A protein has these predicted regions:
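S-adenosyl-L-methionine-dependent methyltransferase catalytic core, i.e., the SAM/SAH-binding region
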Residues: 1-166
Length: 167
């Protein structure tokens, strides 16, 4: 039996490399990392600062939610998430504001997080800052960089000599 010329999978990278359809060597692999703005704006998982919803941010539904991460991490851990995954210049002030605010009550919604970020960000910079903050927590919650690193290692193992990976 001849192997298929094209295999399309709609799943997370961690699951993709366990698929029986991916046995053997490939001359090319395409990894789509994109999250579309339409997904963010219409999503009810807390991925967007434009839609008020629960602070979940999980793509798959398992693992720690953004709400749990925000409410259980130390100020230093939050700072590192914002700095490393969002490259946010105001990481320290935002981390401090999150920890201060959660002493009053648990942070549960996207609009609560948005309000905290806006409170310590000059108006002209708020949209850009909100984008970086939400990106940082999404990456942390979904372990996106760890998953990508794992996926690239697995993809290289499956590649035929001279094959290509497109990310």
């Amino acid at each position: 039996k001849k192997p298929p010329r094209l295999v399309l999978l709609n799943c997370g990278f961690e699951e993709a490399f366990d698929e029986p359809a991916l046995e053997g060597n490939f001359s090319g692999l395409l990894l789509d990392l994109g999250v579309s703005s339409m997904q963010l704006d219409t999503d009810s998982r807390g991925l967007s600062y434009r839609v008020n919803s629960d602070l979940d941010m999980r793509f798959g539904g398992s693992g720690i939610s953004a709400e749990d991460l925000l409410n259980s991490s130390t100020e230093e851990q939050i700072y590192h998430i914002l700095r490393n995954y969002g490259e946010e210049p105001r990481s320290r002030a935002i981390a401090r504001a999150i920890v201060t605010r959660r002493k009053l009550s648990r942070i549960r919604t996207t609009f609560e997080l948005r309000e905290i970020v806006e409170s310590c960000t000059p108006k002209p910079l708020q949209i850009r800052t909100l984008s970086r903050v939400f990106q940082a927590f999404r990456i942390a919650v979904n372990r996106e960089l760890e998953v990508l690193e794992y996926s690239l290692r697995k993809a290289i193992e499956m590649l035929s000599p001279g094959g290509r990976i497109v990310v």
